[in-house]
């Protein structure tokens, strides 16, 4: 009798322990699930805040650049990287500080994505005269292809365009004066192409 009672007590104890263990496991599972949900919620909120801050930062960073660009275009219409260029009537001009032959000057202009100046109006002629007075500057005019047929570097023939030759020029003195420059008076003169003088480059406004 005592043995049966002891056996029943053992079974009751084991059953109670199992139920208690199951209840403890369920509680732990619920706590873990709640913790996971809480972490997920916090992560979502954090990511949303980070995205909002990144968006604001991008806006703040872009605004000064825009303002600087607008200010820069007013101060330097030919471009922030072309501050040595001068603006005149919708185009940009570079007046060199060194002397060289006509062909070297032409190559220098082309390296700067421009060309030797084409003077096709009184307004541009006056602009060049004012800037080049008392000095000689190459312009983009030559008759190397055909003697006496002067053409600009873009192929324009001077017979149907503006000219401003010095009196008595072009005269091909010495039979080798095939390139034109602006004389000290501002008028044009033909001279041999290996002569070294300053030069003027021309290019359109940057887009």
From Swiss-Prot:
InterPro entries, sorted: C-type_lectin-like, C-type_lectin-like/link_sf, C-type_lectin/snaclec_domain, C-type_lectin_CS, CD209-like_CTLD, CTDL_fold
Post-translational modification: Some or all of the cysteines are involved in disulfide bonds.
Keyword Transmembrane helix attributed: yes
A GO biological process held by the record: immune response
PROSITE patterns linked: C_TYPE_LECTIN_1, C_TYPE_LECTIN_2
GO cellular component assignments: external side of plasma membrane
Membrane topology, as annotated: Single-pass type II membrane protein
Species for this entry: Gallus gallus
Highest rank taxon of the organism: Eukaryota
Residues bearing attached sugar chains per UniProt: 67
Subcellular location: Membrane
Extracellular domain ranges by topology: 49-207
UniProt entry keywords in alphabetical sequence: Acetylation, Disulfide bond, Endocytosis, Glycoprotein, Lectin, Membrane, Receptor, Signal-anchor, Transmembrane, Transmembrane helix
Topological region Cytoplasmic: 1-23
Official protein name in the record: Hepatic lectin
UniProt keyword annotation of Transmembrane helix present: yes
Record CDD domains: CLECT_DC-SIGN_like
Transmembrane segments: 24-48
Residues modified as N-acetylmethionine: 1
Function: Hepatic lectin is a membrane receptor protein that recognizes and binds exposed N-acetylglucosamine moieties of plasma glycoproteins, thus mediating their clearance (from the circulation) and endocytosis.
A GO molecular-function descriptor: carbohydrate binding
Disulphide bridges, residue numbers: 78-92, 109-201, 179-193
